[in-house]
């Protein structure tokens, strides 16, 4: 049976979330998984515990990334030598189920599976590529060509990153629907297999008040207790202003901390 391969989109700004995701992929999957991490900050790839290797992405494309890793997911088939399957996952997620069930599911002849109608408010059929299952033998992405065509005005960056009909008119990739429970946007229910904290302004490690913030902190604290997420990881993220300053001692609300900060700020006015 083919070994499970999972690629995570990440960078220095999402190092804490990345480690949390890795911890729960390994915990909830009973077989060995090869985990590859795209570090968009350093244009490199990290496989399991091996040293990072540089990636062949031009600076032109790297500088077009919306997040640190937006374009890197399209390198996956070439990294896999156009063979076998691979999963891509954004780092701001927690895997709650056996990811092997996603990897080995029937793809029904599609080139890749992604979240259908991911952005329904836009009024257009757009695919959510933050979790994907790819048949690497069928997905032959030409990133440089895509950006040439974007600059020519054939379609936009959003069309490319969400595989809209404008993009697919030029590149007829066969995209099929992924079970949405494998990419549950800012929601948790009894069938959720992977929760995606996709709203950048309310992610629990950055802000107070997310409806499922307590869930994130429960998982975060377990990974800390097991030593997988370390104080050093957290201190570095705080120093770089990537996470909340109270992350070490926070609950999902940390009202006391923020009241203290408010009192200090008010006192500073007098």
For every predicted segment, state its role.
Residues 72-117, 124, 133-139:
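GT-A fold catalytic core of metal-dependent nucleotide-sugar glycosyltransferases
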Residues 123-126, 187-189:
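Extracellular/periplasmic catalytic domains that process cell-envelope and extracellular macromolecules
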Residues 24-32:
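Short, acidic, metal-binding catalytic loop of nucleotide-sugar glycosyltransferases
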Residues 76, 112, 129-133, 175-177, ...:
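Conserved hydrophobic/aromatic beta-strand scaffold that supports enzyme active sites
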Residues 34-78:
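Active-site-proximal specificity loops/subdomain of glycosyltransferases
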Residues 2-4, 10-15, 31, 37, ...:
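A glycosyltransferase accessory/donor-loop signature
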Residues 17, 68-69, 94:
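Short, glycine/acidic-rich beta->alpha junctions
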